[in-house]
Amino acid sequence: MSWQSYVDDSLVGSGFMHSAAIVGLADGSYWAYGGTYVPQPEEVTHILKCLENFSLVQSSGVTICGVKFFGLQSGSEGQMKYIFFKKGAAGGCIYTSKQTAIIAVYGNPGDASALQQDLQKTEATYVAVNPADCNTTVKRIAEYLISLDY
């Protein structure tokens, strides 16, 4: 399976997130990505710093595609590190494997625009997602990659 297939089929394709990226822990390079909210290179650099120093998550949050999320929780579990973040009804998570960080976003971080769409009688483009479904899906991919020494 290609790295892009992990994003297209297993992450975004799960329906539990609308955007995802897999980046290298060593250098922040993009291995694969898809969706609307993909972190920009300087945002990936900050995310990697947050994974090394969890206090940054609480003090500065996480920014993805220019949207600032506040950090809910961060820590380590076995060989994985994780960060959970939120903004309004939107949010996401980051899990690491041995060589990658998997970044996922669900919901619409611009809640006001979703409300505006509703007022204009147009359909909102993001479906409500249970955050636990997003987190569990990303965690399982990270665990699988760890089992393959990635």
UniProtKB/Swiss-Prot annotation:
Its main location: cytoplasm. Keywords: Actin-binding, Cytoplasm, Cytoskeleton. Gene3D superfamilies: Dynein light chain 2a, cytoplasmic (3.30.450.30). InterPro entries: PFN, PFN_euk, PFN_sf, Profilin_CS. It comes from the Eukaryota. One of its GO terms (cellular component) is cytoskeleton. Pfam families: Profilin. GO terms for molecular function: actin binding; actin monomer binding. It is found in: Cytoplasm, Cytoskeleton. Binds to actin and affects the structure of the cytoskeleton. At high concentrations, profilin prevents the polymerization of actin, whereas it enhances it at low concentrations. By binding to PIP2, it inhibits the formation of IP3 and DG. Belongs to the profilin family. Occurs in many kinds of cells as a complex with monomeric actin in a 1:1 ratio. This is Profilin. It comes from Trypanosoma brucei brucei.
